[in-house]
């Protein structure tokens, strides 16, 4: 049984490959990105159990990737990998949202133990890992179909839930009504695209209107987007 999906953001290909082989042997699935920009894009899409993030990356640094990721995802565990062993460096990484900090070179057994610990601390059983989608204070469990905004549970119909999940998988991206229709209702749907507007309104009544901060935005003449 797959234990979870781990994103490795590491510019040294040899290190990334070794980590991939070890993690896959342990039962994890692995995705690798070799620079900060690609790593941030992948992490922001969600669906990962944990992120292994090198600090010294081309493009965006690992710390900047983490800082930006934490603006939209406070849940996914992140372990920083770095050759810099000073206390100030560790404090900075932990303060901006890292769950742990591992100094290179490291023993793979220790890293695996830290990964297991981070997953436990995240309060997720390994068989359920990778089912959560988060944005700001909105949290969705795809497996149990539970939706929470802040500390309040929100009940959605099956269609409302599917629409919300689709939008959460494309955060800060403008989605046209046609895209939403084909992905949520199916390519064979025959009907008016206004059904999208109707269901967006249903979701807003439950997830946006009771709160000061609105997450679902109308892009006039185009469609909708989830953004802060």
UniProtKB/Swiss-Prot annotation:
Domain Response regulatory: from-to ranges: 5-119
Single GO MF descriptor: phosphorelay response regulator activity
Gene name per UniProt: ykoG
Residue positions, PTM 4-aspartylphosphate: 54
UniProt xrefs under PROSITE patterns: OMPR_PHOB, RESPONSE_REGULATORY
Coiled coil regions in record: none
Entry keyword Cytoplasm: yes
Protein role: Probable member of the two-component regulatory system YkoH/YkoG.
GO cellular component: cytosol; protein-DNA complex
InterPro entries found in the cross-reference section: CheY-like_superfamily (IPR011006), OmpR/PhoB-type_DNA-bd (IPR001867), Sig_transdc_resp-reg_receiver (IPR001789), WalR-like (IPR039420), WH-like_DNA-bd_sf (IPR036388)
Any GO BP annotation: regulation of DNA-templated transcription
Keyword set, alphabetical order: Cytoplasm, DNA-binding, Phosphoprotein, Transcription, Transcription regulation, Two-component regulatory system
Protein name per the record: Uncharacterized transcriptional regulatory protein YkoG
DNA-binding region extent: 130-228
PTM comment text: Phosphorylated by YkoH.
Nucleotide-binding as UniProt keyword: no
Subcellular location per the Swiss-Prot or TrEMBL entry: Cytoplasm
Pfam families, A to Z: Response_reg, Trans_reg_C
Organism the protein comes from: Bacillus subtilis (strain 168)
Residues annotated as signal peptide: none
């Amino acid at each position: 049984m797959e234990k979870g999906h781990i994103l490795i953001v590491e510019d040294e290909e040899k290190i990334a490959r070794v980590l991939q082989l070890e993690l896959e042997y342990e039962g994890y699935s692995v995705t690798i990105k070799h620079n900060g920009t690609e790593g941030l894009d992948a992490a922001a899409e969600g669906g990962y159990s944990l992120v292994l993030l090198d600090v010294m990356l081309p493009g965006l640094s690992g710390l900047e990737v983490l800082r930006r990721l934490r603006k939209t995802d406070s849940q996914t565990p992140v372990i920083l990998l770095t050759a810099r062993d000073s206390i100030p460096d560790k404090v900075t990484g932990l303060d901006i949202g890292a769950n742990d900090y591992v100094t290179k070179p490291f023993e793979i057994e220790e890293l695996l133990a830290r990964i297991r610990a981070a997953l436990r601390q995240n309060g997720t059983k390994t068989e359920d890992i990778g089912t959560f989608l988060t944005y700001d204070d909105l949290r969705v469990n795809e497996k149990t179909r539970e939706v929470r905004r802040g500390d309040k549970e929100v009940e959605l119909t099956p269609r409302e839930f599917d629409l919300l999940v689709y939008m959460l998988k494309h955060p800060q991206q403008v989605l046209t009504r046609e895209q939403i229709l084909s992905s949520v209702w199916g390519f064979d749907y025959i009907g008016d695209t206004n059904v999208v507007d109707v269901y967006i309104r249903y979701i807003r009544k439950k997830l946006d209107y009771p709160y000061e901060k609105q997450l679902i935005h109308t892009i006039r003449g185009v469609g909708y987007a989830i953004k802060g």
